[in-house]
Amino acid sequence: SLLPTFVLIFEKREMDILEVAKRNQQRAWEVIMDTDIIRIWEGIGAEVNLVGSLSTGLLMRHRDIDFHIYSFPLEISDSFRAMSELAENPSIKKIECVNLLHTVEACVEWHAWYQDRENKLWQIDMIHLLKGSRYDGYFEQVAKRLLEVMTEEIRRTILTLKYETPDTEHIMGVEYYQAVIQGGVRNY
């Protein structure tokens, strides 16, 4: 019978997926520590919150680290000062800024690309928000709710879907969570 072989292969694949997730999450924390990003933003008086896949333990292959950073008042000069300090790190290869202060989002979007010791690029998204604005705490609450309902089966399913998604597809983390939790999706 092929069943024992199939079960063995399936269990190894599942362990591999969990190992990939664990390794990438460890690498993400190395990036955070090497850049000193939290201290940099706190140095301008901002509150720094990790959001996204890393905050929920669901970071897989997409090397992306997300922060929501809150200031009141939000002075664009302070935002640039923090990013100027971050840019001094030689592993930061590129930085982009989108000024959305005069929109309903009331934020400055920063995207930085960090090259790790294996020459892999990590995208660091830093959304600098006006404390008390429309999206203050929104994604932190999404992560909290996700962690409240996430079982080991849901976690493995989300990680598997993220692992199996082709690199050419761009699916937001929240779309995976909704598909699995609300839609019952179990495979790619």
Predicted feature descriptions by range:
Residues 79-87:
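Short amphipathic alpha-helices in soluble, non-transmembrane regions
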Residues 24-26, 30, 85, 101-107:
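P-loop/Walker A phosphate-binding loop and immediately adjacent motor/lid segment at beta-alpha junctions
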Residues 6-51:
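Helical scaffold of the NTase/Pol beta-like nucleotidyltransferase catalytic core
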Residues 90-130:
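Conserved catalytic core of two-metal-ion nucleotidyltransferases
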Residues 37-80:
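Active-site nucleotide-donor binding segment shared across nucleotidyl transfer reactions
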Residues 124-188:
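Catalytic cores of NTP-dependent nucleotidyl/adenyl transfer enzymes across multiple folds
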Residues 72-77, 119-120, 131-134:
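Short, charged/polar surface micro-motifs in flexible loops or helix N-caps
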